[in-house]
Amino acid sequence: KPIIYYPLDAWFIKTTAVKDRMVELNKTINWKPASTGTGRFGNWLENMVDWNLSRSRFWGTPLPIWKTEDGEEEICIGSVEELNNEIKKAAEVLGGETNKHYLHEGILDLHKPYVDEITLVSDSGKPMKRVADLIDVWFDSGAMPYAQWHFPFENVETFAKSYPADFIAEGVDQTRGWFYTLHALGSLLKESVEEKLKEKGLTTQVFNLKKY
């Protein structure tokens, strides 16, 4: 069977906008061995492209963006509380059976297909449906330090005690995976260079391959 290449619309995080910051912050990380930080990871940062965030799959974290059919209006939801408020708002404005199953307890399962049953309403009164895409699973991994404590919605003090990490150990292959997404999200979410992601110690495992 032939391999077919065709263009698709996608959502991106403009990581190139903070490239210089990420490069500088990388120099504050205590890499072991140091050559991983200056070489493999440093080179990856120097040649980074914008992060393709969206995926065309069924299983995963849905992209929390709703759009009108004409694509002129959209909303990005930032929390479960905001989503449930928008669910009720849409039911009041659009009427009928809009979101009838989610008006009392709110939405309990944020995954497909349930989240795609939700209709929201735009500022001009038009119905909005969620875009079909999911979020890159590496975003979930990079968001782990925040998500595990439901930060910033609660556990702020607990989060402050454990972030940033004192020590992270993973395989060298994670320079393009988990290490990168941790570094990218940490750089994007903090407001000043001094508050950016600064792991106090980070080491990589070396894979030894043996022929049997």
Enumerate the predicted regions with their spans.
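Structured secondary-structure scaffolds
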Residues: K1-Y212
